[in-house]
Amino acid sequence: MSKVVLVNPANAAVGYSVITPRWLFVIAGATPTEFAGDPIIVDEPVVAFNPQDVGPGDIVGVGIHTGNCRPGYRVVREAKKRGATVIVGGVHATVFPEEPLEMGADAVVKGNADIIWKEILEDAHLGRLKKVYDGGRVPGELMAKARWDLLDSNKYLMGCIQTVAGCPENCSFCSVWVTDGRTPRLHLNEQIIAEANELHAMGFRYVFFSDDNFTPATHARIARETNAATRANLERVREDRLKLFDEYDRLGPPTLYGFTQMTAECNSDDEYMDAMYSKMRLRGALIGVESFTEEGLRNVNKTWNPVGQKMAEAIQKIQSHGIMVLASIIGGLESDTLSTLKTMRQFANISGTAFAQFPLYSVYPGTKDYHEMIRDWKNRDQANYVPKHAVQIVREKYWLDYDHTDVAVKHPSIASDDLMKEAQESWSNFYSIKEILARTRSGPMSSLPLAAKIFYAVACRVFASLYPGGIAADNVRKTRLGIIPRLSMRAAMRVARRDYDWGIRPQRREVIEEIIDMAA
């Protein structure tokens, strides 16, 4: 009997992973069992793909993004040598469908495969496989439910649930709004709750809500929308989100705590933040700070973001509602100088954010920046051509030989070595023992009991060692973890299975005002 094997490619297998790769189990859920039984799941951050396990008649599905396309193409080659039919999907394949075909894939899936996957399998079985399939953007009510029964829960720190797809923003460095659209698509409440209960029953006590923007329709976002129809839709989305929070509170697991990604604008919506903490049990969120300067925010088309002191106040307000912030601050934007990078490092410390990351600016396929920089690169030798960007892309299709420890773009005034040095110093400073202890003595972490403070300190050190370039999918990691990160990860997995809320607690208003004054 033919097999369906789904592979999440990576450079290094380390035996376990932080977050479950949702796409694997969603496509497993979209795979009809009558075709080939249960699909076989291969998550390469946990275990490497073995080509000997596939042969003629088998179908291998490979999901790639830009960061893991090279190991993905390695899986394509290995599976093809064994006579298997290989189908490639994912964000990178959506943007560049011709590239996987050039690398040997039999077919490519653009967009979401939740609905179209069954048709693709039937075509492959009948020998009529097309080169390109377009799954489009699947409506929220038709999104496939993940097959968590195929998951080895002992290999992961957190489960993964998607509640909304798409993002109404159009940041120039981000491809989400290009590939997933700017109209939020809401997953069915009953499926979200069912998956949460299933993951909790499997032993998980922490879950990652894998939404690119968990808060697409806050008061502030709605207020700045100029299109009447879009504004009305966002108002409906906000009400629907609050209904989800209510239903999740009543029917979801009471000891499953969440992390997600959202915008700083959620600080404008107290009702939303209170519900996220108390009803969704949200305990942490990545916030795209991007830059503490107005010019830096203009560089990334995110001028609606709070800036400077207002961003510090937004972070403090979010944390006052019990949601720890992971502030993501990009280094190497067009307007950056060595001086602004040093200021960025200082501001991260005084902002009071629980966690911070300092990724270097990179230009990803599908983004507005990428298309503009490629145009600049192709016209660089033409007389009288005025480039759109002072930052220059190093070469076309850099990801095929680009090492993610290097810089993919050339900054107009800062050498690549200096950029990497400043980024490393930012990481080292923020996650130094001195600064970690300082955060446990003042601000929201000071309210934690001693055991939770110790857990927070260990979490800081583990995070810095696991994600030295910023939080990303585990399949982007280039090498195996060292012994200390491995031991720390194992300890964290044991602790994270306990019915204990390690998060910060909502704080009194006078405490928040005192913290904001300190930041000022």
Protein language model regions, located:
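Radical SAM [4Fe-4S] cluster-binding motif and immediate context
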Residues: A144-L326, G331-L333, T337-Q346
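Short, hinge-like loop/turn segments at secondary-structure boundaries
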Residues: D58, M103-A107, L126-R128, E225-N227, ...
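Conserved beta-strand positions
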Residues: L6, V62, F209-D211, I287, ...
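Acidic, low-complexity intrinsically disordered segments
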Residues: M1-Y206
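Structural recognition of alpha->loop->beta junctions
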Residues: E99-E119, M276-G284, T343-F358
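Flexible glycine/acidic-rich beta-alpha junction loops that bind and position SAM and/or redox cofactors
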Residues: V14, P97-E99, E169, Y206, ...
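Alpha-helical elements of Rossmann-like donor-binding domains used by nucleotide-donor carbohydrate transfer enzymes
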Residues: V26, R74, I116-E119, D123, ...
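Radical SAM enzyme core and accessory elements
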Residues: S2-P9, A36-D38, D53-G55, L101, ...
